[in-house]
């Protein structure tokens, strides 16, 4: 099976050309904007599943402003990606609470909402390290302080070969703290 201790899976083989830079990116921050049907969420879901299978000590946190919106958005996209990649039997799916577990290693994709900030503190994974955060519909996060607190969810040093990454996906906007931080005044390690 591709991606499991063999040749890496390639998004371009599954989803079309033009995604290689996105797939390979290891910037600390990725800021991905696009209109409806731009494939940003589907591409992110495919990459997430592939990365979990390729990095056996990595785990991911998936966030939206409201926890209740995750099931029909990110969670559904990740289930689609698992099916599309043909690895359904390798994943355990929990719907209450939302949780995806990669069975061969015990790695997790954890889901949280910013509407319950206490559930964002002290997130612990069963195996490895929490390395990556995906913030879907990031424009809904209207308070930059909420994002700063989210950044604290990935703490400490990571073992060699792993990297910290925050990916913000959203539809285009006019005025938002995201534009100011990552486009207008950024000196951070950002993939735009």
Set out the residue ranges of the language-model regions.
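Phosphate/NTP-binding elements of NTP-utilizing enzymes
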Residues: 1-192
């Amino acid at each position: 099976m591709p991606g499991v201790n063999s040749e890496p899976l390639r998004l371009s083989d599954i989803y079309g050309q033009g995604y290689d830079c996105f797939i390979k990116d290891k910037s600390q921050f990725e800021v991905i904007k696009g209109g409806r049907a731009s494939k940003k969420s589907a591409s992110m879901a495919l990459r997430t599943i592939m990365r979990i299978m390729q990095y056996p000590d990595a785990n991911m946190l998936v966030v939206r402003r409201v926890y209740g919106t995750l099931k029909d958005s990110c969670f559904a996209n990740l289930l689609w990606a698992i099916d599309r990649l043909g690895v359904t039997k390798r994943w355990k799916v929990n719907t209450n609470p939302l949780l995806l577990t990669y069975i061969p290693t015990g790695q997790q994709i954890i889901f949280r909402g910013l509407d319950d900030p206490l559930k964002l503190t002290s997130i612990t994974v069963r195996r490895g390290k929490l390395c990556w955060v995906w913030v879907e519909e990031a424009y809904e996060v209207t308070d930059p302080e909420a994002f700063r607190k989210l950044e604290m969810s990935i703490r400490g040093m990571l073992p060699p070969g792993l990297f910290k990454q925050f990916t913000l996906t959203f539809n285009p906007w006019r005025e938002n703290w995201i534009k100011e931080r990552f486009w207008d005044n950024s000196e951070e390690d950002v993939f735009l």
